[in-house]
């Protein structure tokens, strides 16, 4: 449907072949220059999100590394952050130094989402955030995302479960064949309406 290229283009893993992405008339690069924080929770938790062989403390430090902060020098702040996440999100782990790759899928996702929202982002993109998780872990993640919405963050939820999308989203953008086939109100849209857009038999076509 074109979801992966959209994710990659938005967070700039790969440069887009055409078009542009803007928020309030500004590109992602311009937004970052203003100090507005963008966070991303990728679909591949241990491939793109976290380093499996590292503990929570070191994985917390990776976000600071992207900001140009001293790497592997200040360990107190990320360690305190890791300990706080363990307490607040009820992450089950032997300790902050235990490699995250040894944790269950639900706990790994809590670590990843917790790290990304700890920076108080203005825009938070999450891709399939509850895929493969049990029901309790899924609801924990949903709660965290809803809390971000309440705090004023723009949450971009990438997914395919229509029941979840209709429950969580204010607006739903439907992609088909790599193009936007419609944008609907999540409060009033139906699965049938969205399904037609997904198969190009309903809705318009946006470039």
Where are these regions (language model features)?
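Glycine-rich phosphate-binding loops of nucleotide-dependent enzymes
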Residues: 1-207
């Amino acid at each position: 449907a074109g979801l992966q290229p959209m994710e990659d283009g938005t967070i700039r893993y790969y440069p887009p072949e055409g078009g542009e992405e803007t928020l309030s008339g500004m590109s992602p690069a311009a937004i970052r220059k203003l100090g507005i924080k963008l966070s991303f929770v990728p679909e591949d938790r241990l491939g793109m999100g976290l380093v499996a062989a590292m503990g929570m403390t070191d994985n917390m430090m990776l976000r600071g590394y992207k900001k140009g902060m001293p790497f592997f020098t200040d360990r107190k702040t990320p360690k305190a952050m890791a300990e706080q996440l363990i307490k607040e999100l009820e992450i089950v782990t032997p300790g902050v130094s235990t490699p995250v790759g040894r944790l269950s899928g639900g706990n790994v996702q809590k670590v990843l989402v917790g790290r990304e929202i700890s920076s108080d982002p203005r825009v938070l993109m999450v891709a399939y955030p509850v895929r493969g998780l049990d029901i309790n872990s899924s609801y924990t993640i949903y709660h965290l995302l809803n809390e971000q919405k309440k705090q004023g963050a723009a949450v971009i939820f990438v997914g395919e479960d229509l029941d979840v999308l209709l429950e969580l989203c204010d607006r739903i953008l439907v992609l088909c064949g790599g193009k936007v086939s419609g944008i609907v109100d999540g409060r009033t849209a139906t699965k049938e309406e969205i399904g037609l857009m997904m198969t190009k038999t309903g809705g318009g076509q946006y470039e």
